[in-house]
Amino acid sequence: MTNVLIVEDEQAIRRFLRTALEGDGMRVFEAETLQRGLLEAATRKPDLIILDLGLPDGDGIEFIRDLRQWSAVPVIVLSARSEESDKIAALDAGADDYLSKPFGIGELQARLRVALRRHSATTAPDPLVKFSDVTVDLAARVIHRGEEEVHLTPIEFRLLAVLLNNAGKVLTQRQLLNQVWGPNAVEHSHYLRIYMGHLRQKLEQDPARPRHFITETGIGYRFML
């Protein structure tokens, strides 16, 4: 059975979607807020998420960015925002598709089927990563060095997650700036130098001679297990 999570603050829309999706034989879970949606995504492990952008405790774009740190589950945005810039921002953050309200349920169901077919051929990132004496649980957003818990800021954690999910790959400064801070920050390379320094101080055994958070001079950075 296909499990679908609806993250939407309007009860009438959630009820309408639930009726249609359960009629197709799917199991439906609901969340009214960004934070509840992330919790449901981590615990229920749905096969697909339908997401509204205008949530009461935050923007759905932030939901997508946080989710993509540890999950590749398909996300279909269902939003009253119809501007091209909103669609581009959601897709760049990691959404798989975008449908503007008002919408036709038949079109949504068709797009849902396409997203599920596409996702069935992909492999989700491992939410648990270990290197040296560090253990990172991306889904729970918990990090330990040995027995000690390590506290990261939201930006530090987002940068770490992008690096871990691309372990072994060289990521350009522009790629990292876009994925962590957004497209308006792609010229601010000093952000990366500062936050990579923070990660090395907190997670490397010898920050002056890093083994895991490697600088690729003139290009960007690479995480090595």
From Swiss-Prot:
Keywords: Cytoplasm, DNA-binding, Phosphoprotein, Transcription, Transcription regulation, Two-component regulatory system
Taxonomic superkingdom: Bacteria
SMART domains: REC (SM00448), Trans_reg_C (SM00862)
Matching Pfam families: Response_reg, Trans_reg_C
GO biological process, one term: regulation of DNA-templated transcription
One GO MF term attached to the UniProt entry: phosphorelay response regulator activity
4-aspartylphosphate PTM positions: 52
Subcellular localization, as worded in the UniProt entry: Cytoplasm
InterPro entries, per the entry: CheY-like_superfamily (IPR011006), OmpR/PhoB-type_DNA-bd (IPR001867), Sig_transdc_resp-reg_receiver (IPR001789), WalR-like (IPR039420), WH-like_DNA-bd_sf (IPR036388)
GO CC, alphabetical: cytosol; protein-DNA complex
Entries under Gene3D superfamilies matching the protein: 3.40.50.2300, 6.10.250.690, Winged helix-like DNA-binding domain superfamily/Winged helix DNA-binding domain
Every Response regulatory domain range: 3-116
Maturation and modification: Phosphorylated by KdpD.
Regions recorded as binding DNA: 126-225
Role this protein plays: Member of the two-component regulatory system KdpD/KdpE involved in the regulation of the kdp operon.
Protein name: KDP operon transcriptional regulatory protein KdpE
Organism, as annotated: Escherichia coli (strain K12)
